[in-house]
Amino acid sequence: MTDGRALRPARPTIRIDGQENASLSGGLLELRVDETADGLYACEASFGNWGPRDGATGFLYFDRRALEFGKALEIRLGTESIFRGLVTALEGRFPEGDAPRVSVLAEDCLQELRMTRRTRTFADVSDADVFQAIASDHGLRPDVDISGPTHKVLAQLDQSDLAFLRERARAIDAELWVDDRTLKACARQARNEGTVRLGYGNALRELTVAGDLAHQRTSVKVGGWDVSAKQALEHEATESVVSGELKNGVSGASILSSALGDRKESVAHTVPLTLPEAQARAESLFRRRARRFVSGRGVAETTSALRVGAYVTLEGLGPLFNGAFYVSWVRHLFDGSHGLRTEFGVERPGLGSA
């Protein structure tokens, strides 16, 4: 387990097309790197853009030699990478009373899928087959570890490849991301991005966390129509689908039932065509709600180990909120006033015992 208090670099380093650029690293003014559980990580970096060059004083980076569309941008903390992607935008900033700046915006290679929109169908396929096919369409290596039903037909209707894969991932309770040129997809329980320990008053600077019943349900039922059997079908998911994730905590469904009574949800718009499809969708919907029962956002000392898919063990928060949480989003930040810090979101399905 990584300790968030370990020594870390004072500022990030910038690599362009695989080579460290000392001028950009030294001229970095602001940085933001965003990660989410939906994939498509993004980066925005701003640099000073005025100074001496070639015996004169002027703009440093508007010649598009160092910063250019399509170039590979990597952000590192020491030897660890926190972002790899391609430059998709260049922005000039001309503030009052300050020197000009240039900003680059970059996205990882899921931007290729975001920019490809199609209408097509897949017949007699599993979701894993679809992920592998779309990875192949974009020259990505598939690393897919997902289970689920086989579908008679799946339709991609005027959707980008990314939107379609996100839709399928939600349907089977999977997460999607890329690591360099590898397209990855797996269930949350199978995603292993390591663990980090953060203590309040040490590496954990601040945190707001709550157990909230507003969006909890005691069950979720999904109904549809079995075309071949010509009969209705349904599946009801309950607390049992997250029991393995509670870690001795008390679920939102259990507290909701005892405090306010049963609250059941019926979902009709998904229209599954087989019972396995209905089961996969109902269980996915229940898990997504249940996992957000205890959720929080905080600020911590920056470490490359604090990433989406990792588990963070929070300490010093008392019996209700101590313990392991899943990291659902991360935002690494840097500027001249506050240095490096990381904002992050966490969630888990269980409240600790008082």
Regions found by a protein language model. Give the residues of each.
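Short beta-strand-centered interaction patches in the first periplasmic/extracellular domains
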Residues: 1-3, 8, 101, 106-110, ...
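Assembly/oligomerization scaffold segments
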Residues: 1-111
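An acidic/polar, Gly/Ser/Thr-rich interaction patch typically located in mid-to-C-terminal regions
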Residues: 33-66, 206-354
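Solvent-exposed, acidic/flexible segments
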Residues: 66, 80, 120-128, 154-162, ...
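Ser/Thr/Pro/Gly-biased, low-complexity, turn-/loop-rich segments
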Residues: 85-86, 91-92, 111-124, 128, ...
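Short, compositionally biased
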Residues: 86-97, 188-192, 325-337
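N-terminal export/assembly leaders
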Residues: 113-114, 131-155
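Polar, S/T/G-rich
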Residues: 127-132, 136, 160-166, 170, ...
